[in-house]
Amino acid sequence: MSRRRRFKGRDVHGILLLDKPTGLTSNDVLQKVKRIYNAAKAGHTGALDPLATGMLPICLGEATKFSQYLLEADKRYEVTAKLGERTNTSDSDGEVVSTRPVNVALGTLIESLDQFRGPIMQVPSMYSALKHNGRPLYEYAREGIEIEREARPITVFELKLISFEGDEVKLEVHCSKGTYIRSLVDDLGEVLGCGAHVTQLRRTQVATYPYERMLTLEQLECIFEQAKAESIPPREQLDPLLLPMDTAVAALPEVNMLAAVAAYVNQGQAVQVAGAPQSGQVRMTVGPEREFIGVGEIDDEGRVAPKRLVRYHDEHDEE
């Protein structure tokens, strides 16, 4: 019996800034983008809740090797919270577990926000993807099991009050990796004494990626269908929308080297490069074209040692 040939998709590399719609999981939209691009490999860079919208960088091909740098990057959010109701998920997708009157003055709210600025400790929500004994916490939560969680250090660089009307508060948050906005709102509600939960959440920035470069699923699907209708290979319209994969590591200092030196790096060898930093990770480029070949790390001898290298396949792409 012959085995059916597995379809692998095509070799495409880059980062798409997707404007995630509400109501879908991050994996839902990842699979849709992967299918539209017919990509062999794809991964996202930090899940957004189904309720949330906004920037979700999707890494395709070799760009997936550098997704961790975006996971660790700062984020910006716009969040709307409803005071007076606390839910089991800390957002409007959950069940209301307590209702309290809202007697919050503007001055009290402004003063309370001070407690959540700067380096703080935060206890993650039970409805999160953090793992306990190999299982995400939300699975335990759905079974009614409460797992003790340790508070984790996070940093809230900015916390701006946008508006406060009735029982609705709108905030803008600039925070470090690992920050749960739902937990932030839930904690704020407890400090105010009335409870609170998230009703709208939008991620507006990851690292330094520009807001205006985001694309919706509808836009991608429209581009794909229009290309097919005009007998144009969809890749010709879709691939230019991708950002270069090295934008994921743009914060790292660049080390530019000659092609002859890069040949040793591509074989896994550490090399001496004039002008390299004394320590830390670096973004490695080659020649005057500054072709990105991966991320290196300065070893104990001051050499640039390869850490993650870009590898392109030689075979022809599959449509």
UniProtKB/Swiss-Prot annotation:
BP GO terms, sorted: mRNA pseudouridine synthesis; tRNA pseudouridine synthesis
Keywords, in A-Z order: Isomerase, tRNA processing
Catalytic reaction list: uridine(55) in tRNA = pseudouridine(55) in tRNA
EC number: 5.4.99.25
Molecular function terms, GO-annotated: RNA binding; tRNA pseudouridine(55) synthase activity
CDD domains per record: PseudoU_synth_EcTruB, PUA_TruB_bacterial
Annotated catalytic residues: 49 (nucleophile)
Group of enzyme by EC: isomerase
Cited PANTHER family: PSEUDOURIDYLATE SYNTHASE TRUB1 (PTHR13767:SF2), TRNA-PSEUDOURIDINE SYNTHASE (PTHR13767)
Protein's job: Responsible for synthesis of pseudouridine from uracil-55 in the psi GC loop of transfer RNAs.
Name under which the protein is recorded: tRNA pseudouridine synthase B
Taxonomic source organism: Aeromonas salmonicida (strain A449)
Gene: truB
